[in-house]
Amino acid sequence: MRLILLGAPGAGKGTQAAFICRKYGIPQISTGDMLRAAVKAGTEMGLAAKKVMDAGGLVSDDIIIGLVKERILQDDCANGFLFDGFPRTIPQAEAMKAAGVKLDLVLEIDVPSEAIIERMSGRRSHPASGRTYHVKFNPPKVDGVDDVTGEPLVQRDDDKEETVRKRLEVYQAQTRPLVDYYSAWAATGDAAAPRYAKIEGLGTVEEITARALAALG
């Protein structure tokens, strides 16, 4: 199973990715992990990436695609792989297609923006213990304080509504077009095109997992 998981920040991709990878015995590949591993291993592509990063630049799509091709030839990808957060843009998707990277499925987890904002902006945490709460879905016994210590809970900057809205705007502008790109390619009937499936990301984790498994076939 070679697949791409698409969805906005906070759509629950991480939870589903972990489940799919365990079930199929495939690695979850993110560009960040891939870059770090290649730099550490000192591969040709890794050294090229390090040079750019050390200079404070953005690693080019050419280098990223080179790393992808290198990574999916490794033994742990024999049964497939799951791309998490990649490709991010149409040029990356086009470059992957041109490089002949074979895909079986593009799976989109669809959650309305307002539901994501509610989901993320409602998170609260107790920094010392790592305990997490949600003002609506998993509230503490006493509003604003940790159940165990009685210490105040905090809202991470990443979870503030304004930040969440900005991240969603970036997703809509950059990554959302990939949904149209892959669904249009699948509709052409091209033998090289991956299947495209969309599942609803609202409900319990178990319900969403069941939908994901049905889509994976």
Swiss-Prot record:
The EC number(s) this enzyme carries: 2.7.4.3
Location(s), subcellular: Cytoplasm
One GO location term (cellular component): cytoplasm
Annotated AMP binding sites: 31, 36, 57-59, 85-88, 92, 156, 167
Sites where the protein binds ATP: 10-15, 123, 132-133, 203
Region (NMP): 30-59
GO MF term (any one): adenylate kinase activity
Keywords: ATP-binding, Cytoplasm, Kinase, Nucleotide biosynthesis, Nucleotide-binding, Transferase
Main function: Catalyzes the reversible transfer of the terminal phosphate group between ATP and AMP. Plays an important role in cellular energy homeostasis and in adenine nucleotide metabolism.
Name of the molecule in the record: Adenylate kinase
Source organism (scientific name): Leptothrix cholodnii (strain ATCC 51168 / LMG 8142 / SP-6)
Gene: adk
